[in-house]
Curated annotation (Swiss-Prot):
Gene that encodes the chain: CSLA9
Bilayer-crossing regions: 37-59, 363-383, 399-419, 478-498, 505-525
Organism: Oryza sativa subsp. japonica (Rice)
SUPFAM superfamilies reported in the protein's UniProt record: Nucleotide-diphospho-sugar transferases (SSF53448)
GO process annotations (BP): cell wall organization
PANTHER family linked to this entry: GLUCOMANNAN 4-BETA-MANNOSYLTRANSFERASE 9 (PTHR32044:SF77)
Role this protein plays: Probable mannan synthase which consists of a 4-beta-mannosyltransferase activity on mannan using GDP-mannose. The beta-1,4-mannan product is the backbone for galactomannan synthesis by galactomannan galactosyltransferase. Galactomannan is a noncellulosic polysaccharides of plant cell wall.
Subcellular location: Golgi apparatus membrane
Keyword Transmembrane helix: yes
Protein name: Probable glucomannan 4-beta-mannosyltransferase 9
Length: 527
């Protein structure tokens, strides 16, 4: 028996050697080459955007210098006086849509902010689209709407008997009401968004004075960025998206993805593009791409910020990232041919949308992060015959990381944590991206991102604090624990048999996977 036990490992080792040289080594070398190629593509894209951003600031290509945006002024001093109704005619009719679904903790935020916008009361309609399934919450929202209506605000509370199309379906149904025909523009805010009173005064002029502009997008500002380390990581990623990606798209091609909220659309442009469609989980990006292909221009206002809330639980954040990664990949699959054959936009804009906007940022950016740093690099430790050039695993990633940090300078000291966290999240983003490209599994899964508002503060007052307890099934993430074990094994192998080049990175990444795997990330909400 002892002899047989000794022979088995030798047989396994012999089989491994027979397979490794002709099969595993060539495949791993091919994987390294593919990852290096994708890394170069990502590197070039980051450098390109940084150069454009520097040019925008150096040459003053701000929206207010490129487009006319004179303030809209009424003839009378008191714009809300019924006797001066004609004076308000200079102000276009604006519809404000607030889609919500069981938003118990935050529904008052957006309703109150929308009703407090500085705009003539007879030239704005607030439309609350309530898809809530909880009757108690529906009643609370309706009561809040009636409260504002009693103050003279033109507010409409709209419900439907199904949730077909989810958010896209609610927005589409909202546009069918008769009173919408009188509106020229529509501003959209999710339930946790709180625009400042001057939001319409700063966005509508771009649309009024520039008939070729379809969309004005504002930047998100996060009220709970300091809640936990996970929200700080999100702030870094989203600040880069807004300060760099959106700014570059707006400045170079007058095109970028609509963020689904904190933006104002020209209704005629929406209708020309085909309106809201629910074929993917990114109805906002879908509409933006279709409108862009019709020749419409978009403007991003980086200095106009709208307060919002980041998901602070890991479960909510993971669902959000699945939707944000799966949707664009699926939309790319559906629209690639349509974009390539479009006749209304220039060749350079088509290349930008296909290559820069979709391929590099929405697909390659997710895949290379996970495959290269969480699969291929550890595998080369186990198979020393395959080497990665230093420029591929040191220089390019370092430069890309530094360029990513320009969005949030205040979090520069968290850069290492951000890299490790993003590598973990790339696992879920890659999985979602492949689901979207292949159109399988959870491709159209829509889960509303949970926002806590002040709920946790109310549940956990300082004087009666109890350690939150969670069910073990809610906390443990088996996939992350599996990768933690894999990376830890590779790190130990590198120290014992390799050159030790990667061991520090592998152990740090393994620890990060483990921490997230056991659920100690984000805000823990007690049951």
């Amino acid at each position: 028996m002892a002899a047989a036990g000794a022979v088995l490992p030798e047989q396994i080792a012999a089989m491994w050697e027979q397979v490794k040289a002709p099969v595993v080594v060539p495949l791993l070398r091919l994987s390294v080459a593919a990852c290096l190629a994708m890394s170069v593509m990502l590197f070039v894209e980051k450098v390109y955007m940084s150069v454009v951003l520097v040019g925008v600031h150096l040459f003053g290509r701000r929206p207010d210098r490129r487009y006319r945006c004179d303030p809209i002024v009424a003839a009378g001093a008191d714009n809300d006086d019924p006797e001066l109704a004609d004076a308000n005619a200079a102000f276009p009719m604006v519809l404000i849509q607030i889609p919500m679904y069981n938003e118990r903790e935050v529904y008052k935020l957006s309703i109150g902010a929308a009703c407090g916008l500085s705009w003539p009361s007879d030239r704005v309609i607030v439309q609350v689209l309530d898809d809530s399934t909880d009757p108690v919450i529906k009643e609370m929202v309706q009561v809040e709407c009636k409260r504002w209506e009693s103050k003279g605000v033109r507010i409409k509370y709209e419900i439907r008997d199904n949730r077909v199309g989810y958010k896209a379906g609610a927005l589409r149904e909202g546009m069918k009401h008769g009173y919408v025909r009188d509106c020229d523009y529509v501003a959209i805010f999710d339930a946790d968004f709180q625009p400042d009173p001057d939001f319409l005064a700063r966005t509508i002029p771009f649309l009024v004075h520039n008939p070729d502009i379809a969309l004005v997008q504002a930047r998100w500002k996060f009220v709970n960025a300091n809640e936990c380390l996970m929200t700080r990581m999100q702030e870094m990623s989203l600040d880069y998206h807004f300060k760099v990606e959106q700014e570059v798209g707006s400045s170079t091609h007058a095109f970028f993805g609509f963020n689904g909220t904190a933006g104002v659309w020209r209704i005629s442009a929406m209708n020309e593009a085909g309106g809201w469609k629910d074929r993917t989980t990114v109805e906002d990006m879908d509409l933006a791409v279709r409108a862009g292909l019709k020749g419409w221009k978009f403007v991003y206002l980086g200095d106009l910020m709208v307060k919002s809330e980041l998901p602070s639980t890991f479960k909510a954040f993971r669902y959000q990232q699945h939707r944000w990664s799966c949707g664009p990949a699926n939309l790319f699959r559906k629209m690639l041919v349509e974009i390539a054959t479009n006749k209304k936009v220039t060749l350079w804009k088509k290349i930008y949308v296909i290559y820069n906007f979709f391929l590099v940022r929405k697909i390659i950016g997710h895949i290379v992060t996970f495959v290269f740093y969480c699969l291929v690099v550890p595998a080369t430790v186990l198979i020393p015959e395959v080497e990665i050039p230093r420029w591929g695993y040191v220089y390019l990633p370092s430069i890309v990381t530094i360029l990513n940090s320009i969005g949030t300078p205040r979090s520069l000291h968290l850069l290492i944590f951000w890299v490790l966290f993003e590598n973990v999240m790339s696992l879920h983003r890659t999985k979602a991206t492949l689901i979207g490209l292949l159109e399988t599994g959870r491709v159209n899964e829509w889960v509303v991102t949970e926002k806590l508002g002040d709920a946790l503060k109310l549940k956990l007052p300082g004087k009666a604090f109890r350690r939150p307890r969670m069910r073990i099934g809610d906390r443990v993430n088996a996939l992350e624990l599996g990768f933690s074990a894999y990376l830890s094994f590779c790190g130990c192998y590198d120290i014992a048999y390799g050159k030790g080049y990667y061991s520090l990175f592998l152990f740090l990444q393994s620890i990060t996977f483990f921490i997230i795997g056991v659920g100690y990330v984000g805000t823990i909400v007690p049951h």
